[in-house]
C-alpha cells in the first residue's frame, strides 16, 4: 500500500512537471537588464481591454523605465497639470499600452474633456481621472471619449455607485495602507466591476491586495537614481 501511494504521488509530480511549459526568453547582448515586475502580480485575474489582459501596471512617466520593464501597461499620471506633449512622448515611446492622467484635481472642467480626447487620438488605452473630480465632469469625459475611463478612489467613503453611474469604467483604489480594506469593501458591494489598486512595495502587501479583490496592480518601480546607485556599486567591486 505504501509503495502504491509513493508511485501515485510520483506520477502526480511528473504530470505537474509536464504541465509546466518552457517559455523562451529572448535577450540581446546589450538589452538584457530588464526591470521585472513582482512575480506575485501574475496571481491576479487581470482586466481584459480590447482583447489584451492587463495585470501589472508600472506607475511611472520615466521613458527609460517604460522602455526597459516587463509590465503589461503604463500608468502615466503625475503631480502637474496634464500636458499633451508629455502624453504624446510616452505613448510614442512605449511598447505597451498607456493609461494617461487627464486631470481631476487642479485641472477640471472642459479642459479635462479636451485633454482626454487628445490622448485618445494619440493612442492611449484609457484615461485616468483623479479623486476630486465631480460626477458631472466625469460624465462629460466619459461621453467625450471611446476608451475606458478610470476613476481614482482615495477615500473609503467614496460613493462608488455614483461614480459608475457617472460613466466610470474601472475603479482605481489608491488609499495607502488602507487599500486592501477599501478594495475588499468595494468588491463585496460590486462583485463584477474592474478594480485596479496600488499594491505597495512588498510581496505580502501585493498578495493581500489581490486577495481583497483587485484585478490588476499598479507598481511604483525604483527610480533611475536608485537603479544607477546599485549599478555603480557593482562597478566599484
Where are these regions (language model features)?
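Glycine-enriched alpha-helix->loop->beta-strand junction motifs that scaffold or abut catalytic
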Residues: 70-71, 94-97, 122-125, 145-148, ...
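Conserved N-terminal beta1-alpha1 strand-loop-helix module at the mouth
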Residues: 7-100, 104-110, 121
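Alpha-helix-loop-beta-strand connector modules within alpha/beta enzyme cores
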Residues: 81-105, 136-156, 178-202, 235-237
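Catalytic beta/alpha-barrel core
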Residues: 53-58, 73-80, 101-108, 124-134, ...
Amino acid at each position: 500500500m505504501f509503495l502504491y501511494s509513493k508511485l501515485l504521488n510520483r506520477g502526480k509530480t511528473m504530470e505537474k512537471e509536464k504541465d509546466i511549459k518552457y517559455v523562451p526568453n529572448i535577450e540581446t547582448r546589450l538589452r538584457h537588464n530588464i526591470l521585472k515586475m513582482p512575480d506575485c502580480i501574475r496571481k491576479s485575474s487581470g482586466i481584459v481591454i480590447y482583447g489584451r489582459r492587463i495585470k501589472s501596471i508600472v506607475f511611472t512617466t520615466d521613458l527609460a523605465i517604460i522602455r526597459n520593464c516587463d509590465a503589461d501597461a503604463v500608468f502615466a499620471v503625475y503631480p502637474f497639470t496634464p500636458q499633451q506633449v508629455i502624453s504624446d512622448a510616452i505613448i510614442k515611446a512605449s511598447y505597451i499600452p498607456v493609461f494617461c492622467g487627464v486631470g481631476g484635481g487642479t485641472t477640471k472642467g472642459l479642459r479635462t474633456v479636451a485633454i482626454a480626447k487628445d490622448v485618445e487620438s494619440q493612442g492611449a488605452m484609457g484615461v485616468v481621472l483623479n479623486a476630486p473630480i465631480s460626477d458631472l465632469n466625469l460624465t462629460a469625459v466619459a461621453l467625450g471619449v471611446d476608451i475606458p475611463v478610470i476613476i481614482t478612489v482615495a477615500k473609503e467613503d467614496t460613493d462608488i455607485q455614483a461614480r459608475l453611474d457617472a460613466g466610470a469604467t474601472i475603479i482605481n483604489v489608491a488609499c495607502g495602507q488602507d487599500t486592501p480594506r477599501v478594495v475588499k469593501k468595494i468588491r463585496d458591494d460590486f462583485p463584477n466591476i474592474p478594480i485596479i489598486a496600488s499594491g505597495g512595495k512588498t510581496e505580502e502587501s501585493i498578495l493581500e491586495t489581490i486577495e481583497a479583490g483587485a484585478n490588476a496592480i499598479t507598481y511604483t518601480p525604483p527610480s533611475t537614481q536608485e537603479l544607477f546607485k546599485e549599478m555603480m556599486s557593482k562597478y566599484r567591486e
